[in-house]
């Protein structure tokens, strides 16, 4: 079997300008910082990020936002990163806000190859703008489309040659 363990340099060869990158951290905690630092050093830009939040300015995707390397982000909030708010208000960072449970379901749908998820969350609010609404048994739902990425970054404590990842404390 071909090993699924790669060097940092090998990984960075697969990361390019303009890609959609999913960040598997929690507000910058448990971020794949070595890879993110390598992306900064390589000069990767125009990243379309999918992340639970914009993180803190010095952690995770937050580092890339501060360096103006992220052009858009699909996220649940940006409140921990003042630079993200500044860039959003200046029109430098496109932000799609998604309720956290809906965000998680959209990520899951993308990974499972599903066409989307129906949710009542956001019906009757600005969240429904531009989305398909369905009525099932008299109840309104929004169709939320899956999130897909070219690359997903996760930090694991250990990995084996088959690609299995092991995480600290779980």
Segments and roles (model prediction):
Residues 1-170:
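Conserved alpha/beta enzyme-core scaffold
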